[in-house]
């Protein structure tokens, strides 16, 4: 099983999106999560650093500037999705990636406070 570390740049990006109210509170993550074609389209006009900002986890040992390096996507490359944070939290907890789980939890709490 892969191991992950928290992507601090992604956490900071998510916080900025929440502060700017760039979020979706009600969405079906299964329908809106970025698919491979959306990721490829994003990478055609954005840097790997910008791509990385949408992923809470960095795969330990994976090469930089590869999709394998980034895990736990939380938004649609435009806005953060509450359902995406819930999915990140759930998956990280399920596979015992505690640091990513806690980062997703903290962001979810922040989002809920700001959106209240």
What residue ranges belong to the model's regions?
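A charge-rich, low-complexity, intrinsically flexible signal that marks solvent-exposed coils, linkers
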Residues: 1-116
């Amino acid at each position: 099983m892969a191991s992950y570390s928290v992507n601090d740049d992604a956490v900071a990006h998510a916080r900025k999106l929440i502060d700017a109210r760039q979020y979706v509170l009600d969405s079906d993550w299964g329908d809106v999560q970025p698919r491979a074609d959306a990721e490829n389209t994003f990478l055609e006009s954005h840097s790997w650093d910008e791509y990385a900002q949408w992923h809470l986890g960095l795969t330990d040992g994976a090469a930089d500037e590869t999709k394998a390096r980034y895990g736990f996507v939380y938004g649609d490359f435009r806005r953060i999705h509450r359902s995406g944070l819930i999915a990140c939290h759930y998956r990280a907890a399920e596979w015992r990636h505690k640091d990513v789980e806690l980062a997703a939890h903290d962001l979810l709490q922040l989002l809920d406070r700001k959106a209240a």
